[in-house]
């Protein structure tokens, strides 16, 4: 692309906010590159003895710095963190992004989930990856953690290929469940994969990781030009996420709230949130501690802000996570995050045994139109019960 072409794209107004607009696709791709690189750099900081809070701050700073370098000719363009850097260890399911002064460090053998996101003009790319601290042995790791890593990886790859026009959200859920059963691990309850829209990180269309009797599940058919965050979280334990002693440190604005704040401190804090993060999630750590403490209580009490609770499975189990953002394009799906991350060096005694799911995982994300015309009768079809 020439500099002139780049200038035209940077200055082009965005009227259509879906993938039929090339400017929107460019924004998603730019956000994906930054988020992808952020995870790679955060992985390099995850060593024995490293402070988790320092790693999280490094990830946030990296995203902000890289986003500031993009689309510089488009004035007043909002860009930066779409989801704060979280480093959730062992049985912590997610949302661990501690405040300054937290002393948690990484230890040899810790199962570490890195989760973060970037946006350009509200177009969001989020991703997560799991590593094992010190997993550099010449011999592959085996056992339940290895089983969970393999299950989560293959479930993500299968879901990536199923989110296509004509397929439904419930079909994806069933494939995720089948794969977790094959590896003898558990999808964590309450984990949802969401449709993404401009400045909306948790769209109305969702994909459940497992079907549960207590859930009211609405089935959606996927459409061309949609964008989804696929979030796969597997546990070696019972897969029931719960809150423990750690208080939430990540919040987002509740756009449905009409409450008029009474405290000046609360109003000032809200103004800072809107200016820096719009409607997207933010970490308390990135605000002055006095300002956030004074303003937070009223905002939370009256549901002006919604919290992301720090969640845990039971003690003694391990939780793994792989997450990416997928663009559902006419010529196939485009995976924004995670294409270059090496998996932990693990080996499972289990495998994907369903022939249709194996064929699905082995199939390309991009559609070969010539091959598709010749082989329309042999389209991969994962049978559901």
Swiss-Prot record:
It comes from the Eukaryota. GO terms for cellular component: phagocytic vesicle. It holds the Pfam family Peptidase_M24. This is Proliferation-associated protein A. Belongs to the peptidase M24 family.
């Amino acid at each position: 692309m020439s500099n002139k072409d780049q200038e035209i794209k940077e200055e082009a107004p965005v009227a259509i906010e879906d993938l039929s607009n090339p400017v929107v696709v460019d924004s998603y791709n730019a956000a994906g590159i930054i988020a992808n690189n952020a995870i790679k750099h955060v992985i390099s900081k995850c060593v024995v003895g490293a402070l988790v809070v320092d790693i999280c701050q490094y990830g946030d700073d990296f995203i902000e710095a890289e986003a500031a370098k993009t689309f510089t000719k488009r004035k007043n363009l909002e860009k930066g963190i779409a989801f704060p850097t979280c480093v959730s260890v062992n049985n912590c399911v997610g949302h661990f992004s501690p405040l300054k002064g937290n002393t948690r460090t990484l230890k040899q053998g810790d199962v570490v989930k890195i989760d973060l996101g970037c946006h350009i003009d509200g177009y969001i790319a989020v991703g997560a990856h799991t590593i094992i601290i010190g997993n550099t042995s010449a011999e592959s790791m085996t056992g339940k953690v290895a089983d969970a890593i393999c299950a989560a990886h293959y479930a993500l790859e299968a879901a990536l290929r199923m989110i296509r026009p004509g397929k439904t959200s419930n079909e994806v859920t069933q494939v995720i469940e089948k794969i977790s059963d094959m590896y003898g691990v558990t999808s964590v309850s309450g984990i949802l994969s969401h449709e993404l829209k401009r400045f909306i990180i948790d769209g109305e269309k969702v994909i459940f990781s497992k079907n549960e009797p207590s859930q009211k599940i609405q089935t959606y058919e996927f459409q061309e030009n949609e964008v989804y965050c696929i979030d796969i979280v597997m546990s070696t334990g019972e897969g029931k996420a719960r809150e423990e002693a750690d208080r939430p440190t990540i919040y987002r604005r509740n756009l449905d709230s009409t409450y008029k704040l009474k405290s000046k401190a609360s109003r000032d804090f809200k103004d800072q949130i809107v200016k820096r993060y719009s409607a997207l999630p933010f970490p308390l750590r990135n605000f002055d501690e006095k300002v956030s403490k004074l303003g937070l209580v009223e905002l939370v009490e009256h549901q002006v802000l919604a919290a992301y609770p720090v969640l845990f499975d039971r003690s003694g189990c391990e939780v793994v996570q792989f997450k990416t953002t997928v663009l559902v394009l006419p010529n196939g799906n485009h995976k924004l995050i995670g294409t270059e991350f090496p998996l932990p060096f693990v080996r499972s005694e289990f495998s994907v045994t369903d022939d249709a799911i194996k064929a699905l995982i082995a199939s390309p994300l991009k559609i070969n139109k010539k091959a598709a015309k010749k082989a329309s009768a042999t389209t991969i079809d994962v049978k559901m019960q």
